[in-house]
Swiss-Prot record:
NCBIfam families: PRK05826.1 (NF004491), PRK06247.1 (NF004886), PRK06354.1 (NF004978), pyruv_kin (TIGR01064). Mg(2+) binds at E220, D244. The keyword Metal-binding applies. It comes from the Bacteria. Phosphorylated by PknJ. Dephosphorylated by PstP. One of its GO terms (cellular component) is plasma membrane. Substrate binds at R33, G243, D244, T276. The modification Phosphoserine is found at S37. This is Pyruvate kinase. K(+) binds at N35, S37, D67.
Amino acid sequence: MTRRGKIVCTLGPATQRDDLVRALVEAGMDVARMNFSHGDYDDHKVAYERVRVASDATGRAVGVLADLQGPKIRLGRFASGATHWAEGETVRITVGACEGSHDRVSTTYKRLAQDAVAGDRVLVDDGKVALVVDAVEGDDVVCTVVEGGPVSDNKGISLPGMNVTAPALSEKDIEDLTFALNLGVDMVALSFVRSPADVELVHEVMDRIGRRVPVIAKLEKPEAIDNLEAIVLAFDAVMVARGDLGVELPLEEVPLVQKRAIQMARENAKPVIVATQMLDSMIENSRPTRAEASDVANAVLDGADALMLSGETSVGKYPLAAVRTMSRIICAVEENSTAAPPLTHIPRTKRGVISYAARDIGERLDAKALVAFTQSGDTVRRLARLHTPLPLLAFTAWPEVRSQLAMTWGTETFIVPKMQSTDGMIRQVDKSLLELARYKRGDLVVIVAGAPPGTVGSTNLIHVHRIGEDDV
């Protein structure tokens, strides 16, 4: 069977070969993620070109995602490169410039002394080392180590519960976004989203450049969970980024947040990616743990559009095996059922009602496929959220829409000429599906489109059609 859940792979040092990137595409990579927290522009340009070449060579749609670093807060550098903070020690984190020593080190967040208050927690290196703020003395935040461990240059800091006032887009992010858009990426992920207004800052940069692409909100902060519905509505897609989320929130809350975010995204026809440590042990080992296999399976059962591999493919020893393993797990779950938790949302929009009706007609008539003509991808996403067992085929004249739909559940997208009439649409369906050799004359399909063609948001037509028959 054809896999319906999509796979996002992070590119990095482990994937710096043309043949390996092509192998990843052939194994099931649907979206290639470029992580702008690492690498330089030359690295990203080469990676981008590798993906485009592999996509063209294999005929598979592969989207390219630029993941912006966001206002990531880090320690500065230590004179010795590293040290070990023991429980009970006092350490100072300063917003001033200094050469780091064992008990005093700088931070990239220059408002820390203004935002911190006694009792705040400071977590270093994804929570491996924990501090509590005792006092603020000038530029220094004085802390006590409550959970000790090794620390080294540029380790990340999380500040759960602190009212952090860093901007949603740093200067680096603006430069990276400009580069990525000019390069031609298909979508952008914004890190550490806190408010629905954060997307407006990204759109301002996009509008200056003259190119808008979908923006994915990475859910990593408690504020994002508090504003979840508004963020889902404002952004084009969401990513449940469980790494930082698991540091900022109690661990036991993360699975429930994941399920809630997936359901809310589906209710609003927004793609949702589940990320972080899906097959983490495969960074070092050729096989995942049983718990990781269950984690992947449960994300599929929750209704996620796509699952993401991070270190497994960017720096891991077995990137190709990781993709193949994830694909096998997804397929095994889908062989049992493509169903997801039922949607409670009752559509009240024209496109929402039409998508439900097309799904119902197709399933009751035992159609061979649902076919949707789309200019923006919206109608296809509304169909995809229903998790129909019927194949979902998207026809578009826009290559960027084909690439963007690569992260949407169950969607196979084809580039077709711009249509001038509904009769032309139906003839194109016959031509394309017969060329696939998976369909034959007389097979029943349900077509969803807008009439007259050529207007975004004009979906108003459902046509029940037998391939090759003159019913136009």
